[in-house]
């Protein structure tokens, strides 16, 4: 009976245009479908002051103020400098190159890497017509030259696109006296960095191999 009542309530919710639009939007989030979206919306409606209003305000503030840094690709607030590349209290000599923000967060949570990140914003791919002009490749080279970087660690995924991108970056850095390395083999073929467990990630970093003559 309770289940039937909830289903009836959910059907009524869908007849309200604002609710219907919310269901469509929330259903697009990772791991959420229409049923989960409806439960979330019901929770929000039942907690307007405690959840719905502050969530709406926080989303609005994030939309206005959170952007990608044009220099390194990391997320930053428009109200402050980029914590990844413009924080003067942090002085590192390594840059870890990743495809996206999720990869950066995964590596940060493992605590294996102490250095700067450079987030490309994707990979070179013929499938989605993404070209080098679409990625932060030129700014990577500029960062290497300006920041006394000793090593660039390529932490792209073990996909065809990820490896193609890594090779392109390696080739772009060949005339700079710097060590270029990549995560150790052992990453599952086709595997994406954000899906790796800490143990696999730590091993891949510790056993990374040099790719050029500047390597140890």
Located regions from the model:
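N-terminal amphipathic/basic-hydrophobic helices that include classical n-h-c signal peptides
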Residues: 1-12
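Signal for well-folded cores of large energy- and translation-related assemblies
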Residues: 27, 45, 60, 73, ...
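Conserved phosphate/pyrophosphate-binding and hydrolysis machinery centered on Walker-type P-loop NTPases
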Residues: 30, 49, 62, 75, ...
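Extended interfacial segments that mediate partner engagement and assembly in macromolecular machines
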Residues: 37, 87-156
